[in-house]
């Protein structure tokens, strides 16, 4: 292993990994007295193993908070969705896995397709600064985005304000669908959230190592094995190779 790579990715001799605890698909065990477990932490463990260093988790409640700490020497790598706004401060690999994002609509809704949601007068509840919120912010032309801080809060807002649609990741919307009798998850997806590994800017050797790592773990079946290990088959899918 090149000393330059270790210097760029683990300058303190330990790999500090920013983990987004709000993504229940990627962090499936968030017990307070143990390290987080799931596909995302296991990917980080493998990065640290290949670097030959220890690992330290830096836990965040939202991905937006991770992005806020970019460039502040708070973490070395970050496992979050790759979005253009975040790429202004973070260099990303290609995605190692993907999650479908779509809408939940209430009982009796006239909205039957994703395309119908983006029209004047439609109000969409969304978790603020999530990867799919960033996508919607760039792409929604006519509907109004109503933001809440966190996944559960966005559902509560959707219900309390009687909004027209709730944006979210399909597996989480399936849970909300069970809570709201008569609600419907619209078919298809408006985007697929790309889960990637990021590092700080100007770490060319370190980034190249991470890029190669992600591609190798996709093609070798390592990512697929993690998805099966953590019981999220059908919720997460291995991203296509670069």
List the predicted regions and their residue ranges.
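Ligand-binding clefts/hinges and TM-proximal coupling segments of bilobed small-molecule sensing domains
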Residues: 1-7, 131-148, 185-186, 215-242
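Extracytoplasmic small-molecule ligand-binding "clamshell" domains
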Residues: 1-81, 86-88, 147, 220, ...
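Short, well-ordered beta-strand segments
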Residues: 16-20, 104, 123-126, 166, ...
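Periplasmic-binding protein-like
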Residues: 21, 97-108, 153, 170-215, ...
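Ligand-binding cleft/hinge of the Venus flytrap
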Residues: 27-33, 44-54, 93-94, 120, ...
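Hydrophobic residues within well-ordered alpha-helices
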Residues: 47, 69-71, 117, 157-159, ...
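A ligand-binding cleft/hinge motif common to bilobed small-molecule-binding domains
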Residues: 64, 81-89, 159-191
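Flexible hinge/capping segments at coil-to-helix
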Residues: 96, 105-123
């Amino acid at each position: 292993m090149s000393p330059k790579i270790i210097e760029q990715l683990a300058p303190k001799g330990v790999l500090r990994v920013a983990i987004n605890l709000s993504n229940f698909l990627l962090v499936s065990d968030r017990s307070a007295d143990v390290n987080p477990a799931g596909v995302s932490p296991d990917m980080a463990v493998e990065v640290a193993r290949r670097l030959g260093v220890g690992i330290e988790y830096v836990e965040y409640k939202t991905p937006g908070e991770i992005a806020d700490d970019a460039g502040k020497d708070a973490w070395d790598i970050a496992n979050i969705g790759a979005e253009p706004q975040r790429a202004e401060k973070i260099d990303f690999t290609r995605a190692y896995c993907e999650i479908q994002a779509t809408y939940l609509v209430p009982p009796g809704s006239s909205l039957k397709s994703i395309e119908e949601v983006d029209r004047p007068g439609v109000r969409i509840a969304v978790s603020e600064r999530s990867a799919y919120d960033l996508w919607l912010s760039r792409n929604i032309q006519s509907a109004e985005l109503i933001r809440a801080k966190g996944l559960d809060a966005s559902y509560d807002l959707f219900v309390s304000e009687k909004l027209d649609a709730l944006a979210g990741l399909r597996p989480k919307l399936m849970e909300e669908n069970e809570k709201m009798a008569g609600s419907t998850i619209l078919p298809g997806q408006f985007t697929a959230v790309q889960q990637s590994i990021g590092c700080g800017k100007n770490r060319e050797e370190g980034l190249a190592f991470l890029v190669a790592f992600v591609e190798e773990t996709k093609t070798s079946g390592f990512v697929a094995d993690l998805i099966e290990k953590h019981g999220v088959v059908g919720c997460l899918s291995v991203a296509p190779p670069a």
